[in-house]
Amino acid sequence: MSNYWLNIYKPRGISSAQLVSIVKKILGKTKIGHAGTLDVEAEGILPFAVGEATKLIHLLVDARKTYIFTVKFGMQTNSGDCAGKVIATKDCIPSQEEAYAVCSKFIGNVTQIPPAFSALKVNGVRAYKLAREGKKVELKPRNITIYDLKCLNFDEKNATATYYTECSKGTYIRTLAEDLALSLQSLGFVIELRRTQVGIFKEENAIRIKSPDEITKNALEENSIKIEAILDDILVLDATDSQAQQIKYGQKCLFNYEKDFRHLAKFAYREEFKGNTERNTTAYTLVREDASTGLTYKLPLEVEFGKMSVDLLWVRYKGTLLAIGSLNKSCFNSLRVFNLTQDFF
């Protein structure tokens, strides 16, 4: 079985489920999953996991995402986008200065109430199904993070503004648009929504598909991305034959500090070592470069000899992904084990 990622661009007008069906028809009997459903009226990046890559989907779901969206001011729809019915209007339209200035109010940790027309479940039933039946939907507020928000364009004639945002998982852009409009003493809904990035997957190198006849299986595989690609900014350990066998069979596996831990900071990280031999402790400062700005930022990692704990890292064997998991006092606890070769041992 092939194991890789596909960076697919979902066009507007089809559902994420329909796109999954299209990809399945192209690839045949292969295990497939995707990270982060997009609304029918939305377009943009929808990463696909093939084979063993499906075991890593949860990491992409947690990844930061970027969107470009356009808000129409002066009206509100029941769905928060142009697919819904107009339920309220207001004559107050913000100025260009106000549309730009409001962004700073939303950057940081934000509490957001998801829209009634969402896939969240209420007592086991999808919220959007209840909303379509005209039933009242009450969803609990959620804590999300807006890392960046800026206005790209303001069209006074059409009463619209286009925004760019980088946000955490669980962020509803339709709700963000409504909240922006309310903060400007107006109403608003999304008329265009495009997801431009999910983790490492960007729109400039995405594969665009509208039907199974547009591309062959070989062409898809030629544009595939290696399964380890999304792990490049996560700490990694190399396993010996005996360690790999222990992990493979779910046994307790210990890593030696002196031999294994000095090389944790690899790939996107640069390692700076600072030691205090009297206290027998070490502090690692991992410095990562932000590709979009060229700036670097530090990720502190406190390490005590023989008692190192890491929430998430991956283990490879002979250059191949073996498992992801956590490290507790030098003991590796696997979360997922991968079968990427037929004859591992």
From Swiss-Prot:
Active-site residue list: D39 (nucleophile)
Catalytic activity, per the record? uridine(55) in tRNA = pseudouridine(55) in tRNA
Q: Which InterPro entries match?
A: PsdUridine_synth_cat_dom_sf, PsdUridine_synth_N, RPE1, tRNA_psdUridine_synth_TruB, TruB_C
Tell me, in a sentence or two, what this protein's role is: Responsible for synthesis of pseudouridine from uracil-55 in the psi GC loop of transfer RNAs.
Q: Which domain of life is it from?
A: Bacteria
Q: Which PANTHER family does the UniProt entry name for this protein?
A: PSEUDOURIDYLATE SYNTHASE TRUB1, TRNA-PSEUDOURIDINE SYNTHASE
Which GO BP terms sit in this record?
Answer: mRNA pseudouridine synthesis; tRNA pseudouridine synthesis
Q: Which segments constitute the RPE1 insert domain?
A: 261-309
- Provide the species name: Rickettsia conorii (strain ATCC VR-613 / Malish 7)
The encoding gene: truB
Checking NCBIfam families in the record gives: RPE1, TruB
| UniProt entry keywords in alphabetical sequence | Isomerase, tRNA processing
For whether the record's keyword set contains Isomerase, the answer is yes
Q: Which CDD domains match?
A: PseudoU_synth_EcTruB
Q: Which GO terms describe its molecular function?
A: RNA binding; tRNA pseudouridine(55) synthase activity
SUPFAM superfamilies per the UniProt record, alphabetical: Pseudouridine synthase
Uppermost EC category: isomerase
Query: Under what name is this protein listed?
Result: tRNA pseudouridine synthase B
Entry EC number(s)? 5.4.99.25
Q: Describe the family membership recorded for this protein in Swiss-Prot or TrEMBL.
A: Belongs to the pseudouridine synthase TruB family. Type 1 subfamily.
- Please name one Pfam family that this protein belongs to: TruB_N
